[in-house]
Amino acid sequence: MRRHPQTATKHLFVSGGVASSLGKGLTASSLGQLLTARGLRVTMQKLDPYLNVDPGTMNPFQHGEVFVTEDGAETDLDVGHYERFLDRDLSGSANVTTGQVYSTVIAKERRGEYLGDTVQVIPHITDEIKRRIMAMAEPNADGRRPDVVITEIGGTVGDIESQPFLEAARQVRHDLGRENVFFLHVSLVPYLAPSGELKTKPTQHSVAALRSIGITPDALILRCDRDVPEALKNKIALMCDVDIDGIISTPDAPSIYDIPKVLHREELDAFVVRRLNLPFRDVDWTEWDDLLRRVHEPKETVRIALVGKYVELSDAYLSVIEAIRAGGFKHRAKVEISWVGSDDCQTDGGVASALGDVHGVLIPGGFGIRGIEGKISAISYARSRGLPVFGLCLGLQCIVIEAARSVGLTEANSAEFEPGTPDPVISTMADQEHIVSGQADLGGTMRLGAYPAVLESGSIVAEAYQSTKVSERHRHRYEVNNAYRDRIAESGLRFSGTSPDGHLVEFVEYPPEQHPFVVGTQAHPELKSRPTRPHPLFAAFVKAAIDYKEGELLPVEMPERVSNGAERRDQVGQSIPEPANRG
């Protein structure tokens, strides 16, 4: 009788060594895509060793974006990679942090569930980690179990914070049997230019550190800026005691969407299914090859300005970037991102310099007052020139503030930025007021996750979605103040989508006869975009940018309101010269 009967679900762990930011998440995502293309059901999970319960309150400059799942969990940005490569929605259980694990264990101790035991890292913390790992193998809503669970272990081998997670993974292999668990280790093979050599010692030491805690990797991903020669692969296989078929060279790829092809060329997917005795078929490249043609063979190029507060770290807008690029794939267009700090747009000269040669302006989400006037100035500049504008979350709120100021509410602002403003056109949501006032925790308390919306028939957004009923993910505490709807509408801005009860403004836009494309959404549609299924709003935005570039649109006439609300019309194009380089 087998001591470890084959399980219905196999587990594959991805760890990293030598250095951080080697691409463990993209490696895991790409392998997941390959196994999915072989007909297997795959789900993924990220284990994060930090003590935060979730990244929701972390500084974007430190952590990057917060990826919100359908069920409202604030998760690591790698979960976004998982969803995009697998083309499936994941839940909050796809991200486990040390903070979550310790919170659960301490709560159990307070309830007396450990019956007087001394609570320790082993077994109590590791058992809780194992419970969360094994929960990923449970049947989903349709009663089907995944064939493979891919679990990425954050951090680097040797970090103190990662040790409980690595120990838990080791125990999973012990509990389920070696034939049911696979360890993949991502390591750096640096190239020393002065000597012209690739060095294998860092990888050997990284694997030695992993083996010292009881884990022998089944395969190694060798990260390098060039291909690793066969002779060095053989040396690494010998010194690290890894099958030569499991030594995978992964030089830097032109695009992240090329990585599945790189891994397949090295036959990693075949090695995994053979080792885990998985049923499989040949890889179906139909959809992915079409994507790669769109990535590498664009028919045109457009420039989109991303006017944000955190542009020094592109990871703060990772899903936004991928969604814009996917919108370009839809139209066989390459999207070049022009990174614009919103602080740089606060003066007329600054905004003209930053946006003078772009074909579209995207205003992403964010928090806090810094840079807000620059975002509003960018919207005014774009409106006066027929330049397409797309606002996300805070971007919608800035569009509304700009519209309100244009009809005489010169002190219009958000309660977030100016609590004492006489015209709070953006107000705190009723169920968030006690949180904003400091009477409750900030973490995990925003309006989070998927919510439905009803769109106005014939609107730009309804035409883009090809539907009047949609659902999008959210992450916010503030909303359009309904007391100002009628006054704001005097600017021409339409409230083209609301919550089903009509209370919460979800989408705004200017009619095409007033401006070709100014659209804002309170949601974060970038979180649902896929490279093979671009989000319709991003596709529509990129199409508007293409039309702007091709049409060389003339400036539009805008009504200007003086402080008493009276209207004065100026032909903007007569007073402000056209940008010199639009193509």
From Swiss-Prot:
InterPro entries: Class_I_gatase-like, CTP_synthase, CTP_synthase_N, GATASE, GATase1_CTP_Synthase, P-loop_NTPase. Keywords: ATP-binding, Glutamine amidotransferase, Ligase, Magnesium, Metal-binding, Nucleotide-binding, Pyrimidine biosynthesis. Residues 1-278 are annotated as: Amidoligase domain. UTP binds at S20, K199, T200, K201, P202, T203, Q204, K235. It catalyses: UTP + L-glutamine + ATP + H2O = CTP + L-glutamate + ADP + phosphate + 2 H(+); L-glutamine + H2O = L-glutamate + NH4(+); UTP + NH4(+) + ATP = CTP + ADP + phosphate + 2 H(+). Pathway: Pyrimidine metabolism; CTP biosynthesis via de novo pathway; CTP from UDP: step 2/2. Residues 303-551 form the Glutamine amidotransferase type-1 domain. Catalyzes the ATP-dependent amination of UTP to CTP with either L-glutamine or ammonia as the source of nitrogen. Regulates intracellular CTP levels through interactions with the four ribonucleotide triphosphates. PANTHER family: CTP SYNTHASE, CTP SYNTHASE-RELATED. HAMAP family: PyrG (MF_01227). Belongs to the CTP synthase family. This is CTP synthase.
